[in-house]
Design a protein with these regions (language model features):
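Glycoside hydrolase catalytic-domain context in secreted enzymes
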Residues: 1-374
Length: 374
């Protein structure tokens, strides 16, 4: 089982799925109920493809599995120069917490025994810096953490019961998040009662050696990480031979490893992966749900609600074709469908801004002039 697919606004792989508006657009709807519908549709499509692949038996070896998603991104967007800003729900911790909470609930479902999928909120914590993003140190007061950076994660863990969480690349107050016992043991396990499993961001454990310069070698990284409570590595450089060496040299105990393995395997058990498929009602979701008309209509409605009008000189919008003779559409992005970070292959046919305007204008024979460059 390969942990780690993406479902930020639709499933990324394998195959075609319904693509919904980018995360920052989902937040712009200000509609938590709608976001629950979106993530429920996403998890339905995951189960549909899972059944199509004979519950994983026909899946390509080494490919990301369909039932564990590294979503949503509930970091605070403080600087638009940060490349992952579109993955977030914006700069407000309350809105992000509410939207993130509903997204987690929709992904995981409400069955008393089984999870529909595993949701993994990320990146914990204080991760919103582009410069030296893999090794920077966020110096934070307790108040800044508790009032601004942590509330969105708390909602996802405490209220929505997310069963996994991803640690961030950066350090907080001098300690890389990968091994930050304050965040892992005090906040997550202690204050919030988190009982799921904790995964690193990709390559983060080895970067404690090469980028943070926090430990001397991979053996030390493995020792520090497993003892801090990191259950799963995204990658295969540290929790492999280095961890085995650390165990053989009595740097880590069998209990350390067993505890991590227990939490990871518990997540798979909650998905029903060790049970007869017929016992899990989510396994009855048919592949026909993928890209179905209902989901395409939901994507369209979400796109409509996600729109933000920044400027409207002389009340030009909405377009009144009785008063307009020609329309100029300027900019290369108007003729190109850009779905955003972590986009899958769309089952639904994309419509660009230019295509939409042309289709609307042709009703009244209004000329549309397109200039990709000015």
């Amino acid at each position: 089982y390969y942990h780690g697919n993406e479902a930020l606004h639709g499933i990324v792989r394998p195959g075609e799925f319904t693509v919904f508006p980018q995360a920052i657009g989902l937040a712009a709807t200000w509609n938590p109920g709608l976001i629950f519908e979106v993530s429920s549709a996403i998890s339905d499509e995951a189960r549909g493809r899972w059944k199509e692949l004979d519950y994983g038996k026909k899946q390509i070896a080494g490919a990301s599995d369909l039932l564990t998603f590294w979503s949503p991104t509930v970091n605070m967007a403080r600087d638009p120069r940060w490349g992952r800003t579109p993955e977030t729900y914006g700069e407000d911790p309350f809105l992000t917490g509410v939207i993130g909470c509903e997204f987690v609930k929709g992904l995981q479902g409400d069955h008393p025994r089984y999870l529909k999928t595993v949701s993994t909120p990320k990146h914990f914590a204080v991760n919103n810096e582009e410069h030296n993003r893999s090794s920077c140190n966020a110096k934070m007061s307790e108040r800044d953490l508790r009032e601004f950076y942590l509330p969105s994660f708390e909602r996802c863990i405490v209220d929505a019961k997310a069963q996994s969480i991803m640690m961030a690349y950066n350090a907080v107050n001098g300690v890389p998040c990968t091994v930050n016992t304050y965040l892992i043991k005090n906040v997550l396990r202690g204050d919030w009662g988190f009982n799921g499993y904790i995964v690193s961001d990709c390559s983060a454990p080895e970067w404690m050696v090469t980028k943070h310069k926090y430990v001397r070698d991979l053996d030390a990284a493995a020792t520090l990480a497993i003892k801090a409570g990191l259950d799963l590595e995204c990658g295969d450089r540290v929790y492999t031979a280095p961890l085995l060496k650390a165990y053989n040299e009595s740097m880590v105990s069998k209990t350390d490893i067993d505890s991590a393995a227990y939490r990871v395997l518990r997540g798979r058990m909650l998905l029903g992966l060790f049970d007869d498929p017929s016992q899990n009602p989510y396994n009855q979701i048919e592949p026909s749900v993928i890209g179905c008309k209902k989901h395409q209509e939901l994507a369209l409605e979400t796109a409509r609600q996600s729109m933000v009008l920044l400027k409207n000189q002389k009340n030009f919008l909405p377009l009144n074709l009785k008063k307009v003779k020609s329309i100029a559409v300027v900019g290369i992005n108007a003729g190109h469908c850009e779905f955003g970070d972590y986009s899958g292959i769309p089952k639904n046919a994309p419509v660009s801004v230019l295509d939409g305007i042309r289709k609307y204008a042709e009703k009244a024979n209004v000329e549309v002039v397109y200039a990709p460059w000015v």
